[in-house]
From Swiss-Prot:
Keyword line: Chloroplast, Iron, Metal-binding, Oxidoreductase, Plastid
Organism whose genome encodes this protein: Nicotiana plumbaginifolia
Function of the protein: Destroys superoxide anion radicals which are normally produced within the cells and which are toxic to biological systems.
Record gene name: SODB
Protein name per UniProt: Superoxide dismutase [Fe], chloroplastic
Recorded catalytic activity of this chain's protein: 2 superoxide + 2 H(+) = H2O2 + O2
Top EC class of this enzyme: oxidoreductase
Taxonomic lineage: Eukaryota, Viridiplantae, Streptophyta, Embryophyta, Tracheophyta
Amino acid sequence: KFELQPPPYPMDALEPHMSSRTFEFHWGKHHRAYVDNLNKQIDGTELDGKTLEDIILVTYNKGAPLPAFNNAAQAWNHQFFWESMKPNGGGEPSGELLELINRDFGSYDAFVKEFKAAAATQFGSGWAWLAYKPEEKKLALVKTPNAENPLVLGYTPLLTIDVWEHAYYLDFQNRRPDYISIFMEKLVSWEAVSSRLKAATA
């Protein structure tokens, strides 16, 4: 059975940028429901005992998702999202990550502009991602609807922002662009992104 993992920091650690009340609902209710429902869906099936990543790839079913896909992908996406943030985050990346951003987007500022635009223009519910394309050895921005993520495209996710309304509504109401800016300026963990890139390029 999959277990709901806590975020890698206390629930109030991202205040005032992301409130403990948002965590109460977003992690405590939404994320928990994805994990609980997934466990019910796979119990006693051939998916029981597989990793979350394997379940996502199998149930994506080449774009015709099977019933367990949404809960599996959302369970994975949320854990990845919590780990994409840290208290006193933001700032700029460094090292190989910054070099690749400069190479593939022209500059860090250009990347931020594109990432914010991808997150702001994802219609309805979904996610915006920085991903690594292993075949081309390049970074790419991806926006995905609902539960989808770059794993199903064969890419390695490096960073994500959740743009489902439940991610920001208690703190920002309908001001999605403000939430996205705060995420980039105050919350993103470039250390986490760098370590994911290192693993992807090893």
